[in-house]
Amino acid sequence: SDSAKVEKLFQWTVQNIQPTPDDWSVVDDHILNIIIRGHGVADQRADVFTTLATYSGVPAFWVSLPKHSDAQILLSFVFVDDRWVVADVANGFQFRNSEGELATLDELVAQPARLKMYAAERTVIKDVSYAKVFSGLTMPKPQSPLRAELQMPLKRLIYEARAMLSLGTNDESD
């Protein structure tokens, strides 16, 4: 199932792509090199996970939320069973709802106690608790085509042709 596939890809990413140590330089690179190196910063680790999911046939993307805030959470969204479920690769959180299924952002925002099971008060972003940063978040609109799809030859060709002919790309990313 897509859910099982996503769970395995998430676990593989968390186990095999470690956080880049603070005293190492950050290399902005292709995900293949990040996989070979075995480490990356938060957005690189999320990019590995969402690209692997997309290549395996499960659409996925990552984004920092809330937009235009100093305290942001980098979240990954994966389309499983006709809904966008959410994960936090950097913190190793693959969220589940009260039924034990992979959770959507709306489910987590509606159940702050469940979110606190994952992120204790010790988890902070720029001196703001994880739960507080998470509260009030809304599902972002997925980029189209997805970032990982732009690495697929045919999708990239179509994207570039649409851009060149000013037909629009539906790319609302910052």
Annotate the PLM regions:
Residues 1-5, 34-45, 68, 97-100, ...:
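Extracytoplasmic/periplasmic, Sec-exported soluble proteins
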Residues 9, 34-64, 76:
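Cysteine-centered nucleophilic/redox motifs
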Residues 20-25, 46, 73, 87-90:
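Short, solvent-exposed loop/turn and secondary-structure capping segments
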Residues 26-28, 62-67:
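Short, surface-exposed recognition loops or helix-turn segments adjacent to catalytic cores
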Residues 1-37:
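Secondary-structure boundary elements
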Residues 68-70, 78-174:
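His-Asp-centered catalytic microenvironments across diverse enzyme cores
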Residues 11-19, 51-58, 81, 110-113:
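Sec-exported extracytoplasmic/periplasmic mature domains
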